[in-house]
Amino acid sequence: GSIFAFSQPYSGEKLSRGLIGIPTEDGMYFSWRMTLEDAAGLQFDLYRSSGGGAEVKLNKEPIDRTSDFLDRTVDYTVDNRWTLKATTGEVTTWTRLKGEERNPYLSVPVCKPEDGEIAGESFTYTANDCSVGDLDGDGEYEIILKWSPSNSKRPPQRGFTGNTYLDAYKMDGTRLWRIDLGPNVRSGAATTNFLVFDFDGDGCAEICCKTGDGTVDGLGHRIGDAQADWRTWDKKSPTYGKIVNGPEYLTVFEGRTGKELDSKEYIPTRYPLDGWGGVGGNCGNDNTGGRSDRFTAGVAFLDGKTPSPVMVRGWYGRTVVA
């Protein structure tokens, strides 16, 4: 079977209003989503209950021309609860407790991976790329975060890297799962491009990315040969610390759990290593993975209805799309 058998005609995300409140110098600023399903003439009212008291409507006229509102009379010294009511009967709430810092952003706690050491070099982790998607079908976005080690490398650079991790978080910081891409996926900005999209149309987004032997899914299961190590350990080799041999996989993970749903051979392959030269970049070439290990990815509706992962290898000279 094909990994693309997961793809089904796309019916759109079924998201909640996504009501959010951010403190500003002028008051508490609220915004929310409008959806494609909203009927013409839909109106909203915003209410606030302060200190456990009765709800008070904040807007004088129905809100129907925008999807935001500024509460200029909020008292931050007491607990506040706002309720957004639509004329359809839909109700959404937002709560802010007294004493909370008035930061103009929403802070989401995350779980940093432990520091590590490889080939005598210590490394730590920093938060890197992230994406969002409704992983569990509750109508709320979750955050998918890539953790990058401090010894990440550009493709031409020799040397080892720590593993790359993908985490999934609820907006309150609850971690749903962690995927360890393992030792056979080199860490670097040019390597891991992960896609977050509801490919199979079940209302929950999946994660799709390049993996290797020893990748650990969100349930702790290993992909491919768990004992394989395809890194070059010969210090005299021009590919020292790189991965220029061994299988590469394209894997789809379940959004709810991070479980591997399916893995297939990654296309396009890296071979021939010296087949990626051309006029792009510095017009040079190499056979050490400098050009063959540069990736991008995206989602395309190739037939106008069904989402498909699109994987790209090679930035300069030769580029292959699959």
Residue map of PLM features:
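Bacterial N-terminal signal peptides
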Residues: 1-2
